[in-house]
Regions:
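Short, well-structured beta-strand segments enriched in hydrophobic/aromatic residues
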Residues: 105-109
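Active-site histidine-anchored catalytic micro-motif
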Residues: 89
Length: 225
């Protein structure tokens, strides 16, 4: 499989919106802005796009973005479940589509109002529309309401099996912050931290402290392959 897709696709455009605590606009507006910025960055037109891929968690249907921007018929579209690592899955799906001739130009996008919109632990009401919602009943009643609390359980098990210590968690958090500190568009631009500051932060869910967690941020990003 690696031989089939190697050197068959490349990132040709990147687009972002501003990142904030309150975007003041809809997630569709954010997604459309990021996709259009990526199209412009690539020197393309909306009509050049014939494939789209995003997260299953994204609230913006491909057809709505296509309508908003003037993108024509799509030869390929897909969605990758879950959060976090799904971003790499989008690139993989887009690369496979291009390598197999399913599409020529694919945009990968994600938009989120992560603070002013729906927030984790705010509860779920109404009828269950899909089986996906059933699993919440296994941990929500016990206080596991956020991604940090879920990942903390995996982290505890991982540390137990491997002997890994907090040193490794610090390195991950520190490397991630370094990326942000060197990005002028990041809320953490120019703000680094050392081990002492990391250790001084409150525990969110043992073994995870504040700096191990992401912010509730609003914005959108898109890349074009």
């Amino acid at each position: 499989m690696n031989e089939i897709i190697t050197n068959k696709a490349a990132v040709v455009g990147v687009g972002n919106t501003a990142f904030s605590k309150n975007s003041g606009v809809s997630e569709l507006s954010l997604a459309s802005e990021a996709v259009l910025n990526a199209i412009n960055d690539a020197g393309l037109k909306p009509s050049d796009i014939d494939g789209m891929t995003t997260f299953t968690m994204d609230n913006n249907d491909e057809i709505e973005i296509a309508r908003a921007l003037g993108i024509g018929d799509l030869n390929f579209y897909s969605r990758i479940p879950h959060g976090g690592g799904a971003a790499t899955g989008l690139l993989h799906q887009a690369t496979m589509a291009i390598a197999t001739g399913m599409a020529e130009t694919v945009v990968c996008y994600r938009a989120l109002n992560g603070r002013s919109g729906h927030r984790y632990s705010s509860g779920v009401s109404g009828n269950l529309l899909t089986a996906d919602a059933i699993h919440w009943g296994w941990y929500m009643p016990y206080g596991l309401l956020t991604p940090a609390s879920w990942v903390a359980m995996f982290t505890q098990r991982w540390m137990h099996l491997t002997g890994i210590t907090k040193d490794a968690l610090f390195e991950v958090a520190h490397a991630t912050r370094d990326y942000a500190a060197n990005n002028p568009a990041s809320p953490f631009y120019g703000q680094t931290f050392d081990r002492a500051e990391y250790d001084a932060q409150k525990v969110i869910a043992d073994q995870l402290q504040l700096y191990d967690c992401c912010q509730e941020t609003e914005g959108a990003s898109a890349v074009i392959l």
